[in-house]
Regions:
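Helix-to-loop junction immediately C-terminal to a conserved catalytic motif
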Residues: 413
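Transmembrane helix-loop-helix hairpins at lipid-water interfaces of multipass membrane proteins
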Residues: 26-91, 174-179, 186, 289-295
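Transmembrane helices of ABC transporter permease
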Residues: 25-31, 158-209, 279-294
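Cytosolic ends of transmembrane helices, especially the final helix of ABC transmembrane type-1 domains
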Residues: 232-236, 260-263, 308-337, 344-345
Length: 583
């Protein structure tokens, strides 16, 4: 992604409507800043009134207040001022609570929207992308990187608030003591700029390292949970716990470094502010000047410091935090900038509508001069492949492990794009009308993916409850030789099967995958070693059902056992990148 400004990057993650809302938030922040300034600036008159009431008549603010409220008695004026300050602080803090809620909802809403947009982007990336990237990277981008991006947005909001408060308070102090204010502000500004220039690269590097460690921590969890059965059988729990903990220690080291880099400025700013004010006192004492003349100035600086030091510290910490989190924002913008995804809901694939609207079509499948090489590999997996699958027939594909059988099927499915050649269905290239092709195929892999939902939801995967046709679910289950088993369950189709179907046997999981492929009544059915996990008797029953379907569907079957494909109309062998017909 080309270099973009921070503003341009933020525009990428916000829809137009939310950008307008952000502008509205800016004006709301301005109002909050005025309240914060009033809360601090009204304290000084009260302090002056308590310290030297006899000098009040010389104060411009007192004369102005006296015009509005013509009160001669100073005690009454003191009471009015106290009540006014209390009222301002009540309003200020109520408004601050309101702004906190508004900002929190704004950030949470857009955080979720951006995460959904990134998931949409990842779902639209080509299959080769997912072959080359670990799922932990995807999880990090959607969760951790998006959180970093919106932490930056939150930091910018805080920067605006504290920056405006600081400017107003500095202006206020300039009126009180010009040279002292300029001296302190100049010192703080020089220190902040120098410190930021020194630590900026270190913070960015820490942010990059943190992202890498986050991936390793997520990977340790995913691998441990994903292989929990084998892990427990082998007694290797400690390995995965130690792997996570080791990366966790590295993460702690980074956070410690960040705490040091972010914490030092806060303490030094406090030292500079206190040293500046007390330095004035020291100079006055050294010159034997009357200290009573600077009591008012000291009071003003002391009161302003209540808000000024936290604001200055927050500005410094915010700028450092933005540098640390910038790698996360950059990653989010790069994903969006790839243009793999579009706005949520626009140009989205609606498989339900396709399945309802398509007409049944029996047509030949022709693979012409097909060649394919995986990215980062030199030798082609398949070379100059030519196959014809007649409509309504079943074709078996055999070959040793790693020969390229699954790659061939992935190409015909349209998951992979060949470097040479084409695949035709009914004389039309499947890539020219891929959505129509998708609506006509059913796929049964060797390893079935199952969600921690009901049997119904797993058969009709990806559909909302109101879209599911139970009659079609039962028909698909019956065709997969699983209907009787499900009818015997207490909750029937509503039975929860656990994550990855842990409450089912291997054969039952496989048959749910078969039922899923049959739910949409596809024209072409692909079985990628789909019966490998079944016992011989069940495999024969399932294949009998598949063979019965082959009279009305085209079936392409990958298998290791020749008995699985003995009833196929044709058999092809994949060997050394070539495909030859054996029968």
């Amino acid at each position: 992604m080309e270099q973009k400004s921070l503003f341009a990057k933020l525009k990428m993650i916000f829809p137009k409507k939310e950008r307008r809302y952000f502008v509205l938030l800016f004006f709301l922040i301005l109002i909050g800043t005025v309240f914060e300034f009033l809360g601090v600036s009204l304290i000084l008159p009260l302090v002056n009134l308590l310290i030297s009431p006899e000098q009040l008549s010389d104060k411009a603010w007192y004369r102005l207040l006296n015009r509005v409220l013509p009160i001669q008695d100073q005690n009454t004026m003191l009471l009015v001022l106290v009540l006014l300050i209390i009222a301002v602080y009540i309003v200020k803090n109520l408004y601050a609570i309101y702004m906190s809620v508004v900002q929190g909802v704004f950030l949470a809403r857009n955080r979720v929207n951006t995460s959904a947009k990134l998931l949409d982007c990842f779902m639209r990336k080509p299959y080769t992308f997912h072959l080359q990237h670990n799922s932990a990277e995807v999880i990090r981008a959607i969760n951790s990187d998006v959180s970093s991006a919106y932490d930056i947005v939150s930091s910018i909001m805080n920067l605006i608030t504290n920056g405006l408060i600081t400017i107003l308070l500095i202006g206020y102090l300039v009126l009180v003591d010009f040279w002292l204010t300029i001296s302190i502000v100049t010192g703080l500004a020089l220190y902040s700029v120098v410190y930021f220039l020194v630590v900026r690269k270190k913070l960015k590097a820490a942010g990059e390292e943190s992202r890498e460690i986050t991936v390793r921590m997520i990977k340790a969890i995913v691998q441990a949970v994903g292989g929990i059965k084998e892990v427990k059988v082998m007694g290797r729990e400690r390995f995965f716990v130690d792997s996570y903990a080791e990366n966790g220690e590295s993460f702690v080291r980074i956070r410690r470094r960040l705490s040091i880099l972010s914490g030092v400025p806060r303490r030094l700013i406090e030292i500079l502010c206190v040293a500046g004010v007390l330095g004035l006192v020291a100079v006055k004492i050294a010159l034997r000047q009357d200290l009573s003349a600077i009591v008012g100035s000291l009071s003003a600086f002391a009161v302003a410091a209540i808000k000024l030091m936290p604001s200055a510290n927050s500005i410094n910490a915010t700028i450092n935090g933005i540098s640390y989190r910038m790698p996360g924002l950059n990653a989010v913008c790069e994903i969006i900038d790839d243009n793999w995804g579009t706005d949520i809901g626009q140009a989205a694939i609606d498989s339900t509508a396709r399945a309802r609207n398509r007409e049944r079509k029996q047509a030949d499948i022709r693979v012409e001069n097909l060649s394919f090489t995986y990215p980062e590999m030199d030798e082609p997996v398949l070379h100059d492949v030519n196959i014809t699958v007649k409509a309504g027939t079943s074709v078996g594909i055999v070959g040793v492990t790693g020969a390229g059988k699954t790659t061939l099927v992935d190409l015909i499915l349209g998951l992979l794009e060949p470097q040479q050649g084409r695949i035709l269905y009914g004389g039309e290239d499947i890539r020219e009308n891929y959505e129509d092709w998708q609506a006509r195929i059913g796929y049964i892999p060797q390893n079935i993916y199952l969600t921690d939902e009901s049997i119904r939801a797993n058969v009709a995967l990806g559909l909302y409850a109101e879209q599911i046709d139970d009659e079609k679910v039962w028909k698909a289950l019956d065709d997969a030789q699983l209907g009787d088993f499900v009818r015997g369950l207490k909750n029937g189709l509503d039975t929860k099967i656990g994550e990855m179907g842990v409450r089912l046997s291997g054969g039952q999981r496989q048959r749910i995958g078969i039922a899923r492929a049959l739910y949409y009544d596809p024209d072409v059915l692909f079985l990628d070693e789909a019966t490998a996990a079944l016992d011989t008797a069940t495999e024969k029953a399932v294949m009998a059902a598949v063979n019965a379907l082959s009279r009305e569907k085209t079936c392409i079957i990958i298998a290791h056992r020749l008995t699985t494909i003995e009833d196929c109309d044709a058999i092809y062998e994949v060997k050394d990148g070539l495909v030859s017909r054996q029968r």
